[in-house]
């Protein structure tokens, strides 16, 4: 029997290799074929005109009449090519030329015959504000649904676990440290969750991270269940929570909406069964299925380097069945799987769809969010892995040349820019509403403006992570009287997210409108020199309040401009009056050193304020 199974798997591997090689050899015929325009990638105007045998001027005129000035080298988007085909009376169809760079995506997108699909467990992510009970809820569900001797044995390192309900149905929970991890995977194109459970404390209501979690869940476009936690507390007010969430479009079924609300207590284990039953009901309505009878594919949840065992990856199987000795490609890494563990650290021989497991045997550490595919041909896997690395390097190079506010006029004129996505952060709710209303009224021909978050507070890592999930067009994070810290600025630079900071509302509107018209003033640029935290205050009758500080990042120069930032909000912007180090006048103080300063015409310095030194540069 074992020999028979081994032979079947060997034959399956040979068929897979043969099929991949065949796909790699096939060339797609493009152009007009039987009245259908077939294409594989975006074409320039001149290339498109040649393929459909139409005059170049006909295409240029078509877009000129729409207010778009194109030239023969302008790259047409897929939408534009489709629009032109309809204009000239053709159907159109996209075909994919399979290469080693895109074969993984081709394999992942393969649609299985309905007869091969079987029901799979739902994959659930719990999100919400810190201290609203997310960890307690996860722990209570774990402990209620696993054997007592195993309950404490679930490893946190795996990033997910699977439970069996009282009705013998399985549910997989993604155990992330916060919605940042969830968003980070989405920014890499990995959709891992089927259902989001939004947890809100009945005694606290909607809080800032609740709003952020709602933004992330809506962008993921998955069903949402609201779990109102802590109803056992005397001050619990679940109706208040339901009313507050209406503002975000989450309307309870009892009020005529379509969002299930469950009132319960994670710590007292009230209505946990009802939550699980609701998850199963929604999963059945969503008709979640997968094909378990093929080589596995899925996504990497977490990964690290173990000194003794080498690269270790927690993966979630989404299709097929993963087995020991399978050859896996994960992102730019590959290897033969030597060992598979479940969430209890038990060795398992295989993992079916929706099952999270830990695998050993990859040649390097993959990244969270990397997609994986099993290709049981080591030579082929190595070649595809190397091609993936080359593709990643090329994509990183292209990302660095992406849209910027300074150059959007050219991109709009050439029809390349269709969407501008904005995140708005401000010091007060009044400022948020004013900016949101003003920005949403801006009319740029051929461009849609989307505001995906507008809230009070400093620009945070969560804002940058959310911005990174946007795959199309220009993304800008606008800060009004608020600032990012050094860590957030660094993350924004790494992810190529543009941050624009203002303290006058009309300047925000003017900047975006002028950029679209191509008259944005590029003459000046603000350069942040350093940030320091106030750790002590000293009063002096002659010179006022001295802020004793520690430099966190960069330098604080004597001749720089200075901002005072409190809880992410700018409370003063002015000039340094005096700068000292160890009671001696100083020209500058570097990161890791302490000093003291006074500010011209400002004495309301408080401990834990942030001093931000900056200068305005003339751009030549």
Curated annotation (Swiss-Prot):
SUPFAM superfamilies: Initiation factor IF2/eIF5b, domain 3, P-loop containing nucleoside triphosphate hydrolases, Translation proteins. Its main location: cytoplasm. The keyword Nucleotide-binding applies. Residues 175-178 are annotated as: G3. Residues 119-288 form the tr-type G domain. CDD domains: IF2_eIF5B (cd01887), IF2_mtIF2_II (cd03702), mtIF2_IVc (cd03692). It holds the Pfam family IF2_N. It is found in: Cytoplasm. InterPro entries: EF-G-like_DII, IF2_II, IF2_N, P-loop_NTPase, Small_GTP-bd, T_Tr_GTP-bd_dom, TF_IF2_bacterial-like, TIF_IF2. GO terms for molecular function: GTP binding; GTPase activity; translation initiation factor activity. Residues 128-135 are annotated as: G1. Residues 265-267 are annotated as: G5. Keywords: Cytoplasm, GTP-binding, Initiation factor, Nucleotide-binding, Protein biosynthesis. Residues 153-157 are annotated as: G2. GO terms for cellular component: cytosol. The keyword NAD does not apply. GTP binds at residues 128-135, 175-179, 229-232. Residues 229-232 are annotated as: G4. PANTHER family: TR-TYPE G DOMAIN-CONTAINING PROTEIN, TRANSLATION INITIATION FACTOR IF-2-RELATED. One of the essential components for the initiation of protein synthesis. Protects formylmethionyl-tRNA from spontaneous hydrolysis and promotes its binding to the 30S ribosomal subunits. Also involved in the hydrolysis of GTP during the formation of the 70S ribosomal complex. NCBIfam families: IF-2, small_GTP. Belongs to the TRAFAC class translation factor GTPase superfamily. Classic translation factor GTPase family. IF-2 subfamily. This is Translation initiation factor IF-2. It comes from Mycoplasma mycoides subsp. mycoides SC (strain CCUG 32753 / NCTC 10114 / PG1). The lineage of its organism: Bacteria, Bacillati, Mycoplasmatota, Mollicutes, Mycoplasmataceae.
